[in-house]
Structure formats: C-alpha cells, structure tokens
Amino acid sequence: MTHLTLTRPDDWHIHLRDGDSLADTVRDAGRYMGRAIVMPNLVPPVTTTEAAIAYYERIKAHSSTAFEPLMVLYLTDKTSPDEIRAAKASGKVVAAKLYPAGATTNSDSGVTDVNNIYGVLKAMEEEGLLLLVHGEVTDSAIDIFDRERIFIENILSKVVADFPGLKIVLEHITTKDAVDFVMSAGDNVAATITAHHLLYNRNHMLAGGIRPHFYCLPILKRNTHQQALLAAATSGSKKFFLGTDSAPHAKDKKEAACGCAGSYTAHAALELYAEAFEAEGALDKLEAFASFNGPDFYGLPRNADTVALVKSPWQVPESYPLGSTTVVPIRAGEIIGWKVED
C-alpha cells in the first residue's frame, strides 16, 4: 500500500507550551490535526476557566487553519466543584487533568492525594467533564518502571469503582498492565497511546549510549510492554486512540546533565503512527485509531474532511525552531517512510 486517505485525525494529548514557542508548536500541531487536547501544565498552571479561555485565545492567535484547541483544567487540591461547573459552561473546556504532584514536568502544583478531589470528581461526573490521568505514583521508593502499574492498582482502580459515570482517559499508557486494565474496565474508560511508545522501548534509550530525546514520562518500558501497546492500538478496540504527548523542550534542556522529560513528535505524528501500524500489518486499523475513537469517546463529531498519507520517504531535519531556541525531534536526521500530502 502506497497511498492512504484518512478522515482528518485529532491529537488527544499534546503540549503546546506558551509564549514565543506557541507560533512553532501550533504550526506543527495544526498542520493536519483537526483538534487537539492541550495540556494545562504551564507555569503557572491553567487552574481556572478564565485562564483556560485566555490560553485558548493565545493559541488561536497563532493558528492560520481551522485547528481547534480543546482546553483542559489542571486539578489541584484546591480546585472547587464550582470551577468544574464554570468550565463545563464555558464550551471551551472539555476535561480536567489529574497530575499526581511531582509526577512529571510542571506537576508540582498537582494533586497530593486523590481523596482531596473526590468532591470535584463527583461534580465532573455530574457535569460530563472528562477526567484525564497521568497514571504514575510519585513515591521515591517505587521503581520508575513500576509507577504506572502501582498507580493503577492503588489509585485508579478505586476512582473507577467510586465514579462509574465518570469518563476517564488514562493517558500515554506504557505497560501491558495499563492495556489489561483499560480492556477490563467499562465503556467509560479509555486510553491514549503515543507514537514513540509504539515504536521504541527502553533499549532504544539506554543500550549503546544514552539517547536523551527518547527520555519521557512515563518512561519507555521493556519490549514486552511495547508489544502489548502495539497489539492494543491495532486491535480495532474503540478504547484506544491517538495522543502524541508531543512535548517540546529546548535542545540544551534535553542534552544536559539533568535533562527534561519529553519527546517531540508533532512534526511527523501521523507518519510515525503509520510506520508502527504498517509494521504490524494493520494500516487498515489506523483511521479508527487516529480519527474515530477519540471523538467518539469524547462525544464530539468526527472531522468531515480528509488527509492523504503517501509512501514517500523524507529526511527529518536535525532540529525545528522553538521560539528563540530549537527542539530536536524524534528521528532527527533520519528517514521516515510516510508523508502527509500538503
């Protein structure tokens, strides 16, 4: 197969950052994505509806296409049910994000104990606002490769049981444990999967030298977990959909003694997913994963127009502009076999 026409996809998890980076991140995100769930972990975080709408306007100011950002509230111990109701009424905010405090980039203001937000989760269940979850515990005694599994066992399973009417997305899943949990849960639980977790495992990051641009959170796992993710993404299950978790950091912040977590894939998101699906002999499953399952779960219409993927190898630039700096993308300087036609 050398040509694919797909309903325009959406990205159900992306980091656009802010300030002078926005012009570059919005350009890449909006090149062929119809919509994107925009992460709220700015500095300061997007904790109010007012802040979310202001961020929406900053993003739209840099968009020359019909690209539509879907906004997310950042949950803290102090988030109120009234804020949830205001978010739902805004028409711009579609979800709220649970970051366990300290779990990832700019998450220090996150939730210290999920019991602190049970009133908020009840309001979300009543209002129909989705809960997005970074599923890792933060206990320093827990091995970093086990933090997703422990979070599911100790925290998420209880939330799912206590709020059966709450739609929950376990974001950027990385383990067989997460796949099994999502598959066994009700129709109100789904998951996003990144392209880099489908294409790579921890050997790519650590064997033969440390490759900092593969360092992300949740961290890449062993290849058995990678295979479980591939099986889930290509299974045809409606519970799994595209979320790049594309997370730009300036080159000097990645290539450092203590480098930041995050991989940049927005420059070639659909192309990278196509490679993963092609390797599994499942290109026929790509459209549902990229274009149908996400909007169906969110209760939004599917995009009406299409994009074309062609088998046309191209070389990824060594870097892309990121405001006054540069970002090194996944596959920098390497060949990608698929290309979205402009």
UniProtKB/Swiss-Prot annotation:
Reactions mediated catalytically: (S)-dihydroorotate + H2O = N-carbamoyl-L-aspartate + H(+)
Alphabetical list of Pfam families matching this protein: Amidohydro_1
Reported cofactor(s): Zn(2+)
Keyword Metal-binding attributed: yes
Active-site residues, as the UniProt record annotates them: 245
A GO term, aspect molecular function: dihydroorotase activity
Name of the featured protein: Dihydroorotase
Any single GO BP term: 'de novo' pyrimidine nucleobase biosynthetic process
Keyword ATP-binding carried by entry: no
Recorded superkingdom: Bacteria
Pathway noted in the entry: Pyrimidine metabolism; UMP biosynthesis via de novo pathway; (S)-dihydroorotate from bicarbonate: step 3/3
Modification sites for N6-carboxylysine: 97
Transmembrane segments: none
Enzyme class, broadest EC rank: hydrolase
UniProt remark on cofactor binding: Binds 2 Zn(2+) ions per subunit.
Keywords: Hydrolase, Metal-binding, Pyrimidine biosynthesis, Zinc
